[in-house]
């Protein structure tokens, strides 16, 4: 969301509804419904939390499973999350768990922030702690998963042949 103007129209509470109605159409959620200033936590069904949890609640309520037709893009999101490992772990952990490991896409919004090199380096070394993986069911960020997020996952929503990416 960008500022208070029409804030309710920038929420993702309707994504699950339309994703279920149109299963052959892909939905790309820029910024992954992230709201700056929110402290990310474990998703709790029905909690009514804003931001990423709004997107996840919509998917859960409408039975849109992981790796379906909803893609979460990390532009601007990772830039703010990378400074706080626990916040980053919850945000990425939830997106990978509920949107799916094949449906989280890299983005930097570097047009606003300049070189994305710090974001790239931070993501290349970031790991969700074993404690968070055990406690919340988050996945380990492997080299293969990084490759998928950094580019391979974009093949479906952008209609690019996997061979072209290799």
Where are these regions (language model features)?
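Catalytic pocket-lining loop regions of alpha/beta-barrel enzymes
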Residues: 1-106, 132-140
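Alpha-helix N-cap/loop-to-helix initiation residues
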Residues: 81, 112-113
């Amino acid at each position: 969301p960008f500022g208070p103007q029409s804030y309710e129209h920038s929420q993702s509470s309707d994504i699950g509804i339309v994703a279920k109605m149109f299963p052959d159409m892909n939905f790309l959620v820029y910024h992954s419904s992230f709201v700056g200033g929110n402290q990310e936590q474990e998703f709790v069904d029905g909690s009514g939390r804003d931001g990423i949890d709004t997107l996840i609640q919509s998917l859960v309520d409408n039975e849109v499973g992981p790796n379906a037709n909803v893609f979460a893009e990390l532009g601007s999101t990772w830039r703010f999350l990378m400074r706080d490992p626990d916040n980053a772990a919850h945000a990425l952990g939830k997106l990978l768990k509920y949107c799916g490991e094949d449906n989280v896409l890299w983005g930097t919004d570097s047009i606003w922030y300049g070189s994305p090199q710090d974001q790239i380096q931070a993501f290349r070394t970031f790991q969700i702690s074993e404690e968070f993986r055990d406690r919340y069911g988050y996945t380990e960020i492997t080299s293969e998963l990084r490759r998928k997020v950094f580019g391979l996952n974009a093949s479906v929503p952008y209609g690019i042949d996997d061979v072209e990416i290799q």
